[in-house]
Amino acid sequence: MEENTALVVYYTKLHKNSFNALIGALEIDEYFDNLPIYFANKKDIFNLKEVLKKYDKVVIAISFFTTELWKTYELINELKAKYQSYRNKIIYLAGGPHPTGDPKGTLKLGFDVVCIGEGEETFPEFIKAVNEDEDYKKVKGIAYLNDNEFIYTGRRKPVDLNKYPPFPVKHNKFGHIEITRGCPYKCYFCQTPRIFGKKIRHRDVENIYKYVEIMAERNLKDIRFITPNAFGYGSKDGKTLNIDKIEKLLESIREILGNNGRIFFGTFPSEVRPEHVNIETVDLILRYADNKNLVIGAQSGSEKVLELCHRGHTVEDVYNAVRVARKAGLGVDVDFIFGLPGETEEDVEKTIKVMKDLIKMGAKIHAHTFMPLPQTPFAKANPGKVDKKIIRAMRYEIPKGIFHGTWHNQEIIAQKISKYLKTGKL
């Protein structure tokens, strides 16, 4: 390609893995071999004048979560003001969880185009169309405004992870390896199945092996994974455990790393569901992984609330998971979400009892406040509020770090998100 187009990605800690996947998709197409790509941090993004002078067209790509909506609104306005004299050269492109769930609202923030859902196919096609002076508005998987009319070019089929690298090796950018995409569960508070679909897709062990080797050659020997449920790896339906596949994965990686590298499996960002924690899965962690704890999603201590959320597991599953993990000597962090829709005082009391029981068993509680998210069944639900009874019940555990999290900040953000989703106003 001729070097008349440049790409700038807003490469922040929260979104580097997303951009790693997209730049990786560009790298495997020789058409983009000469594409100038700028990885801009929070300072660099305001120092692009030399780039804008040099190229005819510049795509500025920004990914963000709903929790970052207000900061992103400020950012796009600041960029537009600073680079106003270059406006005819710039295309502001948004992608990620919030733009996918709220594309029209994202365009109204000031973006020119939104990439909806998975971008491994859409992103390269879009950049190529821009560079070739073709009508990029015909690219499938995007949305834009035409005289204030919302236009969506249509959803793409789910991508095959094995066709794309998890990160851009040629650009020397590395990170977590995405091993599974999609989620068969339909938790009403979660965007994952709405963004990536309910059909589970796994990266093959051989493909993962290849990229672990590449990292190891560069002395990058802490291996972490991106997956909605670590113990779901290799499962055809995402629900039935495939112990052999999980073992093959971990064993293969351990062979590459030997004793000089570390494998983190079942901790952030690859937590596990409680019903999948059993003697076999825990044994795999003990034999092959380096993490000394598991992060387990409980979300509530009330059967009723779990059913309202469509979680697909029981309170007893949570007890059993903690029991098995602790017996094996693993630490446990259990996620709870407070203020979920339909939660009553009785449900709060039940959750407090469960948390106290789990703490006695040796678990820690990772506390969250329910935040409504676009595209989810709970999008228009009232924002979560942490019942004072919970804080009182946990008052001795908070200073010890046994009950931890940013629930207070989330409570404030949840109010703002709820107002926005109900009114469309920031």
Swiss-Prot record:
CC cofactor: [4Fe-4S] cluster
Coiled-coil intervals, chain numbering: none
Keywords: 4Fe-4S, Iron, Iron-sulfur, Metal-binding, Methyltransferase, S-adenosyl-L-methionine, Transferase
EC annotation from Swiss-Prot or TrEMBL: 2.1.1.-
GO molecular function (one): 4 iron, 4 sulfur cluster binding
Entry keyword annotation includes Metal-binding: yes
Gene3D superfamilies: Cobalamin-binding domain, tm_1862 like domain
One BP term from GO: methylation
InterPro entries listed in its UniProt record: CHP04013_B12-bd/rSAM, Cobalamin-bd, Elp3/MiaA/NifB-like_rSAM, rSAM, rSAM_horseshoe, Tetrapyrrole_Bchl_Biosynth_MTs
Radical SAM core domain mapped to chain residues: 169-409
Top EC class, one word: transferase
Cofactor note: Binds 1 [4Fe-4S] cluster. The cluster is coordinated with 3 cysteines and an exchangeable S-adenosyl-L-methionine.
Residues annotated as binding [4Fe-4S] cluster: 183, 187, 190
SUPFAM superfamilies cross-referenced by the UniProt entry: Radical SAM enzymes (SSF102114)
Domain B12-binding: start-end pairs: 1-137
NCBIfam families xref list: B12_SAM_MJ_1487
Family affiliation: Belongs to the methyltransferase superfamily.
Protein name (database record): Uncharacterized methyltransferase MJ1487
The organism of origin for this protein: Methanocaldococcus jannaschii (strain ATCC 43067 / DSM 2661 / JAL-1 / JCM 10045 / NBRC 100440) (Methanococcus jannaschii)
